[in-house]
């Protein structure tokens, strides 16, 4: 049985816009552009027959999922393993950082494994954060670079094998301060 997975990052937040690096340290909310991005993502997802959404419990991911799916009958299930890494994640020596990278990846991969094993739906969306979305793609065999706000990656799982199908970008250009040349 083919199963479709749609991994997407939350829409732009004020903190993204300001160029802040905040990970899971604070609760951030979508900007007007972030809301517009989520609506565009919803247009892309509208014919994908999404049956369930798994989400980071952080408001920006839930808010993006609610807007994009736009259907109160579709359950949004939060999972703490879909939270972005903390800001202090990159501090320490190389061995400490590598261990945290491995632990973080294994946490995210175990979440995906549990969804695959326990959820019988065929069209599943996962709303999270840039680093988490990148790790999900990597767990499916695709190495992605920077993940933009509301960018979505479509994978098919068929007979235990992952296939990358396509990706969606909202086309809404936002200027995050961290994206500007120094």
Predicted regions and their residues:
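Active-site signature of alpha/beta-hydrolase-fold catalytic machinery across serine-
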Residues: 67, 135, 139
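Active-site loop/turn elements of alpha/beta-hydrolase fold enzymes
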Residues: 10, 81-82
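Beta-strand elements within well-structured catalytic alpha/beta cores of enzymes
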Residues: 4-8, 122-128
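GST superfamily/GST-like fold recognition
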Residues: 130-134
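Active-site-proximal alpha-helix that buttresses catalytic centers in soluble enzyme cores
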Residues: 2-3, 8-72, 101, 147
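Internal catalytic-core helix/loop-beta-alpha segment
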Residues: 95-119
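Short, high-confidence coil segments that cap the C-terminus of an alpha-helix
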Residues: 50, 120-122
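Acidic, low-complexity terminal tails and accessory targeting/binding regions
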Residues: 2-3, 44, 77-78, 84-96, ...
């Amino acid at each position: 049985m083919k199963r479709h997975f749609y991994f997407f990052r939350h829409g732009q937040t004020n903190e993204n816009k300001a160029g802040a690096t905040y990970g899971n340290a604070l609760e951030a909310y979508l900007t007007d552009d972030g809301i517009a991005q989520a609506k565009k993502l919803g247009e892309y997802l509208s014919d994908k027959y999404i049956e369930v959404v798994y989400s980071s419990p952080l408001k920006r991911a839930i808010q993006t999922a609610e807007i994009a799916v736009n259907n109160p009958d579709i359950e949004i299930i939060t999972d703490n393993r879909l939270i972005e890494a903390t800001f202090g994640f990159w501090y320490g020596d190389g061995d400490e950082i590598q261990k945290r990278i491995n632990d973080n990846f294994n946490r995210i991969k175990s979440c995906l494994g549990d969804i695959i094993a326990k959820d019988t739906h065929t069209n599943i969306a996962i709303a999270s954060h840039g680093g988490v979305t990148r790790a999900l793609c990597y767990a499916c065999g695709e190495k992605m670079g920077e993940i933009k706000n509301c960018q979505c990656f479509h994978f098919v799982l068929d007979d235990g094998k992952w296939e990358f199908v396509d990706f969606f970008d909202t086309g809404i250009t936002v200027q995050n301060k961290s994206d500007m040349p120094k």
